[in-house]
Structures are given as C-alpha cells and as structure tokens.
Amino acid sequence: MKTKTSLILTVAALALSGSALAEVKIALVAKSLGNGFFEAANVGAQQAAKELGDVKVIYTGPTTTTAEAQIDVLNGLIAQGVDAIAISANDPDAVVPVLKKAMQRGIKVVSWDSGVAPAGRQIHLNPSNNALIGETNVKLAADALKALNVEKGDVAVLSATPTSTNQ
C-alpha cells in the first residue's frame, strides 16, 4: 500500500516538477471516507509527502459511495486550486466531465485503484488485475477451509460498488 501510494504521489509530483509553486497540493480522493483501505492509502500518502518535501496531501472523499457525491468533492478541489488529483473512482464514466474541467484548468489527474475512463485522466496506476485478485482470494479461502477440514459450504462474494472498475 505504501509503495503504491508513494508511486502515485511521485508521479503527480513529477508531472508538476516544472511548476514554480513552493508547495504542491495533491488531492487523494477516496471512493468513500471511513474505509480502511483508503485510510491506509492516506497514511502512505502523508509519509510519501514528507519524504518528497514541499508536497501537501489533501485526503478527501465522499461519505457515500456515489458518483454524484464524488463529483461534489472534485468540484470543491477544483475551486481550491489543487495542483493534482489522484482518484479512485466510484464510476469510471460519471466523473469524466468534472475531471476534464480540472485538466482544462491545468490540474494533473491520476486515477488509481478503480480507474477513470481515459478521457478523464492523464495516467492510471493499476495495482493488480481483477483475475489475479479473484484467483488469489479463492485460493486463500479454499486453503483456509481445507485447514479447518471444511469440505462443503456456501460462498458469498462482497463488493464495494457495482460501478467500480475493480469490482
């Protein structure tokens, strides 16, 4: 997690390296606040910001996992004049218009974890692929059940949001 978050911030900082700004403001936009995965990403982002120096990470996101709520957050960040937005999108297409607006204003846009359609970003950092994640999860679950001598049972699959690109 820390490596991936450091990579995201480094890419965003390098994209802004020609800027004369004293401090680079990078918004780390989660699918939703209060999610342990994104809280861990924030910890890594804050650490990477310290290591890079002159980088301020603004960790934010909606309280609900809807595209509309995320769009509201993005509009606020554009109004604040952040230098870069690193987003894990709730919906890959719905956020494109607001991210295009951000890019038109010179804001660098990176998607990570759950990607944004190419028209709404400059780069996407994919931490893994869905097939590998699914295969690994099933193998780990099967191994754990086998260790407990469980040979039969029901399986439930939980997902974050149906519109996420990584679900």
PLM regions: where:
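Bacterial N-terminal signal peptides that target proteins for export
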Residues: M1-I8
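A residue-level marker of the well-folded mature domains of exported/periplasmic proteins
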Residues: T10-A12, L21-Q167
